[in-house]
Amino acid sequence: MIRPYSPSDKPAVLHIWREASAIAHPFLSAALVAQAEAMIRDQFLDLAETWMIDADDMPAGFIALLGNEVGGLFVLPSHQGKGYGRALLDHALHTRVELELCVFAANHQAHGFYKAYGFQAGEERLNSFFDQPEIVMHLSR
């Protein structure tokens, strides 16, 4: 079930982000991960249009949108590969004709997921906050 984010979901979002990020971003330092988590908790969730996906009445993943930009799409590792990420992207596309996102170049699993969904890789650039190369990806329906 996909539903709107509620402020009471904040602990679940942070848990999902930590668990999924630990697998997807092992190349990030613990200090950067802590800074990013604080930014998500204290700023990002208040700015983003966020949608939750539940499994067995518990949050299993989320997508956070800033206009047409996917600011974050994370699914608990135990629920990955079951269509939750695809369902969240489908939901985002119901109200948008295009989406854009950035994915770390070293995150090959996510890059493959987005490519399989239909995103096209664009420019590669440096994410200055994380000091990591990232790929800009676009999708138009």
Indicate where each model-derived feature is located.
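Conserved active-site alpha-helix within GNAT-family acetyltransferase domains
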Residues: 86-87, 107-123, 127-132
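Conserved beta-hairpin
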Residues: 48-61
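Conserved acetyl-CoA pyrophosphate-binding loop and the N-cap/start of the following alpha-helix
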Residues: 79, 83-91
